[in-house]
Amino acid sequence: SFIRNATNKSGWQIFPEFVITQGVKSLPALEVFQTYFGCGKIFINKRYDNHHEHLYRFCVRSIDDLSKKIIPFFKRYRLRTAKQKDFLVFAKIVRLMERKQHYTPRGMRRIANLVGTMNRKKRSRFLESPETIRRSPAKRDKI
Protein backbone atom coordinates (compact mmCIF):
# COMPACT_ATOMS: atom_id res chain seq x y z
CA SER A 1 0.00 0.00 0.00
CA PHE A 2 1.03 3.58 -0.64
CA ILE A 3 -0.03 6.22 1.86
CA ARG A 4 0.77 9.91 2.05
CA ASN A 5 3.25 10.66 4.82
CA ALA A 6 4.51 14.22 5.15
CA THR A 7 7.38 13.12 7.39
CA ASN A 8 8.94 11.00 4.62
CA LYS A 9 11.29 12.73 2.20
CA SER A 10 9.24 11.54 -0.77
CA GLY A 11 5.92 12.37 0.88
CA TRP A 12 4.86 8.73 0.58
CA GLN A 13 5.20 5.58 2.66
CA ILE A 14 5.07 2.09 1.21
CA PHE A 15 4.19 -0.92 3.27
CA PRO A 16 3.54 -4.46 2.05
CA GLU A 17 0.45 -6.14 3.40
CA PHE A 18 -0.52 -9.80 3.17
CA VAL A 19 -4.23 -10.20 3.92
CA ILE A 20 -6.68 -13.10 4.11
CA THR A 21 -10.30 -12.03 4.58
CA GLN A 22 -13.08 -14.30 5.82
CA GLY A 23 -16.54 -14.11 7.31
CA VAL A 24 -17.24 -14.72 10.98
CA LYS A 25 -17.86 -18.44 10.39
CA SER A 26 -14.26 -18.82 9.19
CA LEU A 27 -12.67 -16.76 11.97
CA PRO A 28 -11.19 -19.95 13.53
CA ALA A 29 -9.31 -20.58 10.26
CA LEU A 30 -7.72 -17.12 10.48
CA GLU A 31 -6.73 -17.87 14.07
CA VAL A 32 -5.05 -21.08 12.87
CA PHE A 33 -3.04 -19.04 10.33
CA GLN A 34 -2.00 -16.58 13.03
CA THR A 35 -0.91 -19.36 15.38
CA TYR A 36 0.86 -21.36 12.66
CA PHE A 37 2.87 -18.40 11.35
CA GLY A 38 3.40 -16.84 14.77
CA CYS A 39 2.80 -13.38 13.38
CA GLY A 40 0.15 -11.02 12.08
CA LYS A 41 -2.99 -9.59 13.57
CA ILE A 42 -6.69 -10.23 13.06
CA PHE A 43 -8.90 -7.20 12.51
CA ILE A 44 -12.64 -6.88 12.16
CA ASN A 45 -14.07 -5.05 9.15
CA LYS A 46 -17.52 -3.99 10.22
CA ARG A 47 -19.99 -3.91 7.38
CA TYR A 48 -23.01 -1.70 7.31
CA ASP A 49 -24.30 -2.57 3.86
CA ASN A 50 -26.76 -5.27 2.84
CA HIS A 51 -24.49 -8.08 4.06
CA HIS A 52 -25.38 -9.75 7.33
CA GLU A 53 -21.96 -10.53 8.75
CA HIS A 54 -18.80 -8.60 9.44
CA LEU A 55 -15.55 -9.67 7.82
CA TYR A 56 -12.31 -10.53 9.58
CA ARG A 57 -8.82 -9.92 8.18
CA PHE A 58 -5.62 -11.76 9.04
CA CYS A 59 -2.95 -9.20 8.19
CA VAL A 60 0.87 -9.41 8.13
CA ARG A 61 2.84 -6.22 7.45
CA SER A 62 6.32 -6.93 8.81
CA ILE A 63 8.81 -7.28 5.96
CA ASP A 64 10.77 -9.75 8.10
CA ASP A 65 7.70 -11.94 8.75
CA LEU A 66 6.66 -11.72 5.11
CA SER A 67 10.07 -12.70 3.75
CA LYS A 68 10.84 -15.42 6.31
CA LYS A 69 7.43 -16.96 7.00
CA ILE A 70 4.62 -16.05 4.59
CA ILE A 71 6.45 -16.01 1.24
CA PRO A 72 8.40 -19.26 1.80
CA PHE A 73 5.18 -21.02 2.85
CA PHE A 74 3.25 -19.96 -0.26
CA LYS A 75 6.21 -20.70 -2.52
CA ARG A 76 6.27 -24.23 -1.16
CA TYR A 77 2.47 -24.65 -1.13
CA ARG A 78 1.48 -22.74 -4.25
CA LEU A 79 -1.89 -21.11 -4.57
CA ARG A 80 -4.09 -22.86 -7.12
CA THR A 81 -6.10 -19.81 -7.99
CA ALA A 82 -5.68 -16.66 -10.04
CA LYS A 83 -4.10 -15.13 -6.92
CA GLN A 84 -0.84 -17.02 -7.61
CA LYS A 85 0.20 -14.41 -10.19
CA ASP A 86 -0.48 -11.59 -7.72
CA PHE A 87 1.42 -13.45 -5.03
CA LEU A 88 4.54 -13.70 -7.22
CA VAL A 89 4.39 -9.95 -7.87
CA PHE A 90 3.91 -9.35 -4.13
CA ALA A 91 6.97 -11.51 -3.35
CA LYS A 92 9.01 -9.47 -5.84
CA ILE A 93 7.91 -6.22 -4.16
CA VAL A 94 8.93 -7.55 -0.75
CA ARG A 95 12.36 -8.53 -2.16
CA LEU A 96 12.80 -4.99 -3.53
CA MET A 97 11.87 -3.57 -0.14
CA GLU A 98 14.35 -5.87 1.61
CA ARG A 99 17.01 -4.29 -0.62
CA LYS A 100 15.76 -0.82 0.44
CA GLN A 101 14.65 0.03 -3.11
CA HIS A 102 11.51 1.71 -1.78
CA TYR A 103 13.64 4.56 -0.41
CA THR A 104 14.61 5.79 -3.88
CA PRO A 105 12.30 7.58 -6.34
CA ARG A 106 13.14 5.04 -9.03
CA GLY A 107 12.44 2.12 -6.68
CA MET A 108 9.15 3.65 -5.58
CA ARG A 109 8.02 4.01 -9.21
CA ARG A 110 9.08 0.44 -9.94
CA ILE A 111 7.09 -0.85 -6.96
CA ALA A 112 4.09 1.31 -7.92
CA ASN A 113 4.15 -0.12 -11.44
CA LEU A 114 4.32 -3.67 -10.08
CA VAL A 115 1.39 -2.95 -7.76
CA GLY A 116 -0.49 -1.70 -10.84
CA THR A 117 -0.22 -5.15 -12.43
CA MET A 118 -1.95 -6.80 -9.50
CA ASN A 119 -5.67 -7.45 -9.17
CA ARG A 120 -6.77 -3.96 -8.18
CA LYS A 121 -9.96 -2.04 -8.73
CA LYS A 122 -8.35 1.39 -9.04
CA ARG A 123 -5.03 2.91 -9.96
CA SER A 124 -2.60 3.75 -7.17
CA ARG A 125 -2.87 7.35 -5.93
CA PHE A 126 0.93 7.38 -5.91
CA LEU A 127 1.04 7.02 -9.71
CA GLU A 128 -1.56 9.79 -10.14
CA SER A 129 0.16 12.22 -7.75
CA PRO A 130 1.51 15.45 -9.31
CA GLU A 131 4.75 14.92 -7.37
CA THR A 132 5.20 11.53 -9.00
CA ILE A 133 4.44 12.88 -12.46
CA ARG A 134 6.98 15.69 -12.01
CA ARG A 135 9.57 13.15 -10.90
CA SER A 136 8.90 10.70 -13.72
CA PRO A 137 12.06 9.03 -15.00
CA ALA A 138 13.70 10.23 -18.17
CA LYS A 139 13.11 8.02 -21.19
CA ARG A 140 16.54 6.48 -20.73
CA ASP A 141 15.65 5.31 -17.20
CA LYS A 142 13.94 1.95 -17.22
CA ILE A 143 11.73 1.05 -14.33
Pin down the residues of each PLM region.
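Internal intein/HINT superfamily modules and their associated LAGLIDADG
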Residues: 1-143
